[in-house]
Amino acid sequence: MPNVLHSGDLGDIIYALPVVKAMGDPGIFYITTRPWTKAMTPDRFDTIAPLLRAQSYIKGAEWWRGEHPVVDMSTFRSRSGRGLNLVAWQAQAVGVTPWVCQEKWLEVEPDEGMNGRILLHRSARYHNDLFPWTETLHSVGKSGLF
């Protein structure tokens, strides 16, 4: 991947990861703050940086100080994303296939206490009324965690 810059919210940054992985060789993931999102503070940076650094396809995560060249992924919201999820929207903005999320893209150390559990995340901000929550809950049963 080339060096990338992102100024989105934490969720935007997380859902940029499959796109970043699809860009190729490891580069630096730079983070900055912009007026159109919740301010990226040092505390918020410290929250997300360990996850970014844990990815084999990212060489490092740093606060942006004007380094070049970078692919600015912050501009994805300036394009129409109607009907797209955050991965596809960001992929479209940088010319990457939106299907990149079909491959494993998040790497974390296993937690033995979670063995056999299925972690589900429902954003407080984005809801899809067409998602089959009832069927999903029945499918995962007591293995599911929110």
Predicted regions and their residues:
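Catalytic machinery of carbohydrate-active enzymes
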Residues: 1-146
